[in-house]
Amino acid sequence: MGSRSRARQVAAALGFVGLLLAALGAVMIVMVPSIIKQQVLKNVRIDPSSLSFNMWKEIPVPFYLSVYFFDVINPNEILQGQKPQVRERGPYVYREFRHKSNITFNDNDTVSFLEYRSYQFQPHKSRGLESDYIVIPNILVLSASVMMEDRPMSLKLIMTFAFSALGERAFVNRTVGEIMWGYEDPLIHLINKYFPNMFPFKGKFGLFAELNNSDSGLFTVFTGVKDFSRIHLVDKWNGLSKVNFWHSDQCNMINGTSGQMWAPFMTPESSLEFYSPEACRSMKLIYKEQGVFEGIPTFRFVAPNTLFANGSVYPPNEGFCPCMESGIQNVSTCRFNAPLFLSHPHFYNADPVLAEAVSGLHPNTEEHSLFLDIHPVTGIPMNCSVKLQLSLYIKSVKGIGQTGKIEPVVLPLLWFAESGAMEGETLQTFYTQLVLMPKVLHYAQYVLLALGCVLLFIPIVYQIRSQEKCYLFWSSSKKGSKDKEAIQAYSESLMTPAPKGTVLQEARL
């Protein structure tokens, strides 16, 4: 009797525990998604208490700038009107360091900051040295010539004389370091003397001179602390709500983020918008596919075919015109009116006429398309490679002898890939806090519910089995009683004397 009582108590205890576990599992199924969402919102907003704040402030991801130059093989022939021939040189790789300063939190749920960048050459990652010589178009001479095309002949003749006096030619042979970070040029000194605010270059001219050890402008972005719906969106850049480089309000709009983080909880219908000070415009990337980076699920976003399309192909881009062939963007209005063009490397995704006009170009998707891999739950980039090309429109200009007989052509100068991937301790912390723990909680809720249901069945099964035993005992007891009554009745019948006249028959075996 004691063992049966203990079994009943154990079964009841297990049932009670099962009830608690099942209830906890059910509550978790209802509450965990909300808890995870709140934790994500808490940790991705721009707030000193958030997990991602230090990541936002001092980007721990190693970024690399890989630069490829187009070495002009036949400069003299180009001056005679022949087709340009180029050879790709590089990559010349630089480690890019970024840090934010002057961080100021404002009362309207925004934060203002300056982000400084610096670059260090990485010989072990490069295919060549900064001392390598490259033949490129003389950007100052050829761009100034195109800009002066419609000016009076007298001015063009004066310019020809000035170029000759300063020893300026249509093509220059300079080292990688000089092209990147600047070289002394007498024309720059002359311009700075008489037109001091015309160029940002002080004494030296270099394609990346203005980027090294400098900031990309004063960004003011929404923190998401008070209003999650606007998290990371740019409110102003250099105090402006829109720029004035282009010819339409839509093209002048500052849309999206500053290009480092995006709103969490993305779907395949989401897009990535960001403002690029270097391109002087907002850009929009579209969803392509799901993927996995180091065990972390990602969404890959790529450039649409319309990113650099001209106005005739994609009317919303009409504001970026005057346009040439589709696939290149005229950035002259934000680059001192120099005839510079932005595009994908090797004129990938552009009108084939552009690549066919220059020998040595081989556009392909694998090498020349850009992408960003984003963790969709947090909106944080895991892996990215942004690739862009800078080209110069050159042509013969009547009255300027240095331009010779150059046929009109958009000649590539260089292309670069700005790449970075999360790694090391940062990757491990991110994976543990924002991927592994939510995954553990997700599975734990169903395990608890299933285990609770199993334990709940124990007292039920015990009760059923106990009732069966009682029924069997009662049935066997009742049957035994009937048998005893039958035997007793039979015995009494044998002991009773037979009535007179009854003949007893002999029992035979």
UniProtKB/Swiss-Prot annotation:
Disulfide feature: C251-C384
Membrane topology label: Multi-pass membrane protein
Extracellular side: 33-439
InterPro entries documented for this protein: CD36/SCARB1/SNMP1, CD36_fam
UniProt keyword Transmembrane helix present: yes
Complex and partners: The C-terminal region binds to PDZK1.
Name of the protein in its database record: Scavenger receptor class B member 1
